[in-house]
Structure formats: structure tokens, C-alpha cells
Amino acid sequence: MPISLLSKENNSLKLIVGNYPLELVNSIRRASILYVPVMAVDEVYFIENNSPLYDEILAHRLAMIPFSSDEALDHYRPPEECAECKENCDGCYARVYLDVGANEGETVMVYSRDLKTDDPAIVPISGNIPIVLLGPKQKVTLEARLRLGYGKEHIKFSPVSIAVVRYYPHVEVKGNCEKAFEVCPEGVFGMENGKLFVKNEVACTLCEECIKYCENNIFISAVENKYILEIESVGSLKPERILIEAGKSLLRKLNQLKKLVEGL
């Protein structure tokens, strides 16, 4: 199989990709970072803020909170139409509201769960993200607008925390060397009856730390035309959706190039 599943968790996906050019696999990785849109706070209107944080700092914190974006991709207009929208912006924005205060003699930590949105499909991915600590008689009241955006605009619009392509490793043990078991940072090797063996080959990152101590007993190489693609989502989208949308973005760019060349 050219593509097979290595592992899958809630927000993480690892694929083994074979017989595809490295350039193509890396393009999908880059597109996952830069060209898959997600919802994020774009503008904040402060009504009241006497908290310890300036408006700009508080707005930045709000912008970096990931929001669920799966349904937004299907129902909101794309970034190309909304990034600089001044008129006829229907379908561009969702709104979020915050109105929290502390009474006399108390302190209140404001969390992402205190944000109220006008679209139930667009909510913070976690309600436990701290925003600001309010002291006695301090209050924050604001309204913010969210829109779809690309990671190339700002990292707040990037759906991934990790997007990595690495070579698929091949590890071969030619002789016994217990030191490799001790120094390998990835747990590639195991020991059984005093003998070294390869326990988890795919975990090898080709760092060659083991070879420093066991130069003639261990051989490490990268398998030709075989790679490991790892995607970890921040939670706005499932990793599978990120890869699908990354592929779509590449196809759109290729179609744009085709039209440009045909028009020459």
C-alpha cells in the first residue's frame, strides 16, 4: 500500500507514505500549516476593561484560543472573501461575547468557558484556557468577531501544532552493544537475555546517537521513497479533515496555475 496508517489518536495522525515524491508529501505538510482555514478571533470591541491587561494584550490572548471549525468550513465564506471585507459581509463572521466581573473582596479567573458565542457550532476547544485574573471590582466586557483565515496570515489561523515529514528508518543490529539500549532517546532498542534487538524501528529519528557508541554493530539508514507524515491538530479540526483540506488547497493552486499557463 502506498499509504498506510501508522497510528491515530484524538488529535494526532501518523501515516506511512511510500512511492510518492518527497516534494509532494512536503507540500501537503506545508499546506496543512498555511492553507487550511479555521475560525479565530479577528477583531475585538472593548466595552469595559479595567483588568490588569491592556486591551491589546487581552485581544491577543483571545485570538490565540482555538475554536471548533469543522462546521464553519461548510457554512462560512472563505478567507479570500472576508479577510478585508468592508461591505456585504454576511456569512463572514461569528460573534463571541464576554461579560465577567469580580465583586469587592474577591478575585475571579476568567476562562474560555466564559465566552458566549452566537453560533453553537463554534466554541473554544477547551473551557479551561485561562484568559485573565480579575481583582476586586475589576470587570471585562467585550464583543469579538471570528472569521475563517489561513495560517499564512497569522499563526492563530493554523490548525496544526505539529506537521512533520521524516524519512522512514531502517535499523539493523549486526552485533551486541548494550550501550545502544541505554543511550537511544526514542526507545528503539530492547534487551533480551543480554542480547540487543530492534524493538520499535519506526520510532528511530536517525539521530545516530547509538552509532557513536556502537559504530560497527548498528547500521541505520533511510528507506528510499518512504516517509512518515505526522499531523497534530490544535483541536479546531480533526487531523483527517486537515489532510483532506490540505489536498484540496493544492488542487486549487494547480488549477490556478493551469489557467494561468493556458492564458499565455
Curated annotation (Swiss-Prot):
InterPro entries: 4Fe4S_Fe_S_CS (IPR017900), DNA-dir_RNA_pol_30-40kDasu_CS (IPR001514), DNA-dir_RNA_pol_insert (IPR011262), DNA-dir_RNA_pol_RpoA/D/Rpb3 (IPR011263), RBP11-like (IPR036603), RNAP_Rpo3/Rpb3/RPAC1 (IPR022842), RNApol_insert_sf (IPR036643), Rpo3/RPB3_RNA_Pol_subunit (IPR050518). The keyword Iron-sulfur applies. It is found in: Cytoplasm. CDD domains: RNAP_D. GO terms for molecular function: 3 iron, 4 sulfur cluster binding; DNA binding; DNA-directed RNA polymerase activity; metal ion binding; protein dimerization activity. SUPFAM superfamilies: Insert subdomain of RNA polymerase alpha subunit, RBP11-like subunits of RNA polymerase. Pfam families: RNA_pol_A_bac, RNA_pol_L. One of its GO terms (cellular component) is cytoplasm. Binds 1 [3Fe-4S] cluster. This is DNA-directed RNA polymerase subunit Rpo3. The keyword Metal-binding applies. It catalyses: RNA(n) + a ribonucleoside 5'-triphosphate = RNA(n+1) + diphosphate. The gene is rpo3. It comes from Sulfurisphaera tokodaii (strain DSM 16993 / JCM 10545 / NBRC 100140 / 7) (Sulfolobus tokodaii). It comes from the Archaea. [3Fe-4S] cluster binds at C204, C207, C210. Keywords: 3Fe-4S, Cytoplasm, DNA-directed RNA polymerase, Iron, Iron-sulfur, Metal-binding, Nucleotidyltransferase, Transcription, Transferase.
